[in-house]
Amino acid sequence: MGRGLLLVLWGWMVLWSVLSGRLDLLLRGVFHSLVGASGAALITAGLLLVFLHRSARKVIRWPWLVCAAMGSLVLLIPPNPSFSDLASNRPQGLPEPAELAFVLPPEQRSLTEWVRLLRSQPDPQLVDGNPVNISGFVWRQPEGPPLIARLTVRCCLADATPSGLVVAWPADAYPKANQWLAIKGQMTVGERNGESTAVVEPSAIKPIPRPKRPLEP
């Protein structure tokens, strides 16, 4: 019976992660239904075990108590990943760009779409003066000013790759690592590591809450 209750607890933990939106911080949305089905299956299996062994009396083993405590902690303590730290420990790289990203008007491109465009057309002069309307988290760099960045995933945080844009931060701006910002402005041409690069010149910077789904495909 104890094993059945443990399965119910862990099944509810998985299902609650989907329903509460916590899973959006860890996994691409396309996989959420599969995870939700797994949680429902665990609950069903647990209830079945409880029903079949409802009259049996067994000593509750300490590993079961540890698992139950861990499941309870996961339910009580929401995940709070540091995207800036994760980005600093991951290689940069993006999947092949979608054609749509290149035909969108500049002000409609997301940060990731801008990065893909600039990698396919590395001459920053081609985008000089283009309007920019992006959002992302502040990614601290070992040297130089922080970037504005997003994480892209194929499946989950384990395969996340960062993509960032250089920003000409105003003198009175003090962006904090992991802070989410919405930036409006235009693309200009600057220099980074001795090479010409596209630089976002902000006309407006606004702190925003972390998006419901911060990971991009």
PLM features: residue spans?
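OB-fold single-stranded nucleic acid-binding module
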Residues: 22-26, 84-85, 91, 123, ...
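Membrane-interface segments at or immediately adjacent to transmembrane helices
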Residues: 78-138
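Internal/C-terminal transmembrane anchor helices
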Residues: 57-83
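Bulky hydrophobic/aromatic packing residues
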Residues: 31-32, 112-115, 172-174, 187
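N-terminal amphipathic alpha-helix initiation
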Residues: 1-4, 169
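Domain-scale activation on soluble regions of proteins
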Residues: 21, 27-31, 41, 55-61, ...
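Membrane-embedded alpha-helical segments of integral membrane proteins
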Residues: 3-55, 59-60
